[in-house]
Amino acid sequence: MNIRKAAAGDLSRIAEIFVFNNRMNFYPIFKDEGFSFGELQVVSLADAYFKNIISNIYVFDDGVVKGFIQINETEIVKLYVDTFFQSEGIGGRLMEYAVKEFHADHLWALEKNTRAITFYQRHRFQLTDEKKFEEGTTEYLVKLALCPAERVEG
């Protein structure tokens, strides 16, 4: 298995994957240059954000950290794969790991991020009727839940 608990030495790589994915996927939606290219920086994110939640992060590492997943109880909080390694099954393996090892059963996705929603649906998560505003924005997050037949009883 190429998935392991994140270590302090992974922080800059995790932040790098997060920053570039955010710029690619969310800048077209929010169009906030100040955030995407100003506030959103690898070093400050690794230092101020990711080091505080490292205990909840797992990385896909086959010699290079290619993606990561953050889990909080049974919620998938973040799932990112380096853009260079997308479409290689890494995201799916991280999702399977979260479901199997942590009984992950739900997540929230930006409503306009249809690519992500389609990915989650391919991996047995379905849209629910729940939605909420992304904090500090006018954009909605939609809740996806693991199909009931797919849930693992623990």
Task: Please describe what each predicted stretch is.
Residues 2-16:
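A short beta-loop-alpha structural element at the N-terminal edge
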Residues 19-46:
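Conserved GNAT-fold acetyl-CoA-binding loop/helix
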Residues 54-67:
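Conserved beta-hairpin
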Residues 76-86, 109-110:
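A short, internal acetyl-CoA/4′-phosphopantetheine-binding micro-motif in the GNAT/acyltransferase core
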Residues 87-100, 118, 122:
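Conserved acetyl-CoA-binding loop-helix of GNAT-fold acetyltransferases
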Residues 100-112:
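Conserved GNAT acetyl-CoA-binding A-motif
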Residues 108-110, 126-143:
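Conserved catalytic-core motifs of GNAT/GCN5-like acyltransferases
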